[in-house]
Amino acid sequence: MPITQYKAAAVTSEPCWFDLEAGVQKTISFINEAGQAGSKLIAFPEVWIPGYPYWMWKVTYQQSLPLLKSYRENSLPVDSEEMRRIRRAARDNHIYVSMGFSEIDHATLYLSQVLISPTGDVLNHRRKIKPTHVEKLVYGDGDGDTFLSVVDTDLGRLGQLNCWENMNPFLKSLNIAMGEQIHIAAWPVYPGKETLKYPDPATNVAEPASDIVTPAYALETATWTLAPFQRLSVEGLKKNTPAGMEPETDPSTYNGHARIYRPDGSLVVKPDKDFDGLLYVDIDLNESHLTKALGDFASGHYMRPDLIRLLVDTRRKELVTEADPDGGVATYSTRERLGLNRPLDPPKDERHGIVGVAGQKSAEQRKAGDL
């Protein structure tokens, strides 16, 4: 049975723009802070490391290239020592960590999320299935084995989605069908509605994302919904402006948009415009009972699977495949290829690929204090 009552935290802060190492250090600092406050879960925004490339919405492709190069150089491989440091921080603080980051794998960037357990294991590694609009100039698509969201934990069934994925009715239905109880609606950095100059979809500014999309997700799914958001400063505006262009001067429109909602869609907490830090909430999973009693969609008593069904394909689609010795096709999962099934800190012999009796004996001797 999961723990039904616990504290959780959502990050509303400015990323360390174009600086992988500083971003890792700030991430670990927040994990330490949340752990010391007694939180069992901390949620970071979309592409928290190295920040959301919001400049791509404001400049031409040619103007963006120097920023794009620096952004790629500071993106985070999921199988890197930097990620292992973040995983160790989760383990040291006995806390679940939901973190969005720009993942670089081979030569492609992905809008990725990980869910790290209190033992430092990566329980889920997912990639946004379809980058939004101009994001396609920076990121690639997720695959069949990297898009599932909901994981069974001792805090309940916890799910994560990135930005406009939280509006996707198919992903929402899938999460409901998987029994999601706690949801991380990870958002990037958004301008306020006062910045609009032309007729534009309402969801292209922060207020609807914070005050319409996110509570609608909470209500429709009956989940505790944490919506971490990035922030911007005057210095951040300068860093995100190509050379030769005048940066914006007022960052306030980008700030104050993080939210936490109850399973009935009611607001728990939102920050002031100048707040930078952690928003806390005391979660009680039993609060979802009445919302679920009225509307258990997708997999429960308020749906008709004999009439409406969702087809899901979680297979990885390979560009290159190899024939196996039995005449079939050899395949592998993204998790396996990136080493996410291996222990965080395996014994030295295992890290060098040596597995056998000698290695087992050495481990036993180390445990006994002989080495």
Swiss-Prot record:
Coiled coil (residue ranges): none
Domain of life, source organism: Eukaryota
Enzyme class, first EC level, given as a word: lyase
Domain CN hydrolase residues, every copy: 6-285
Region: Disordered, residue numbers: 339-371
InterPro entries: C-N_Hydrolase, C-N_Hydrolase_sf, CN_hydrolase, Nitrilase/CN_hydratase_CS, Nitrilases_CHs
This protein's record includes keyword Phosphoprotein: no
PROSITE patterns registered for this protein in UniProt: CN_HYDROLASE (PS50263), NITRIL_CHT_1 (PS00920), NITRIL_CHT_2 (PS00921)
Gene3D superfamilies: Carbon-nitrogen hydrolase (3.60.110.10)
Catalysis performed (reactions): formamide = hydrogen cyanide + H2O
Induction profile: By cyanide.
UniProt subunit comment: Oligomer of dimers, forming left-handed helical fibers.
Family of the protein in this entry: Belongs to the carbon-nitrogen hydrolase superfamily. Nitrilase family.
Name of protein: Cyanide hydratase
Organism field: Stereum hirsutum (strain FP-91666) (White-rot fungus)
Underlying gene: nit
